Amino acid sequence: HQQFHCAAAEGQAKKSFSCKYCEKVYVSLGALKMHIRTHTLPCKCHLCGKAFSRPWLLQGHIRTHTGEKPFSCQHCNRAFA
């Protein structure tokens, strides 16, 4: 963290990471890798083929197929996905 700020203070060029799919630029490789998932959509539903960038989004989508509703209201007991 400190190296990043010290390099900037000394006038050195900051390293940047560009997305090959769009024009977005990031200051860390990790941030770029997370962004690239929005283009590659690596989490694919085996039932319908719909693709998602994050596993938890796929998990929520799977519930549309299974009908699972793991969350319920404490007051009325109505269930939600």
From Swiss-Prot:
It is found in: Nucleus. It holds the Pfam family zf-C2H2. GO terms for cellular component: nucleus. Keywords: DNA-binding, Metal-binding, Nucleus, Repeat, Zinc, Zinc-finger. Gene3D superfamilies: Classic Zinc Finger. A zinc finger (C2H2-type) spans 1-5, 17-39, 43-65, 71-81. One of its GO terms (molecular function) is RNA polymerase II cis-regulatory region sequence-specific DNA binding. Its main location: nucleus. InterPro entries: Snail/Krueppel_Znf (IPR050527), Znf_C2H2_sf (IPR036236), Znf_C2H2_type (IPR013087). SMART domains: ZnF_C2H2 (SM00355). Belongs to the snail C2H2-type zinc-finger protein family. PANTHER family: PROTEIN ESCARGOT, ZINC FINGER PROTEIN. This is Escargot/snail protein homolog. It comes from Apis mellifera.
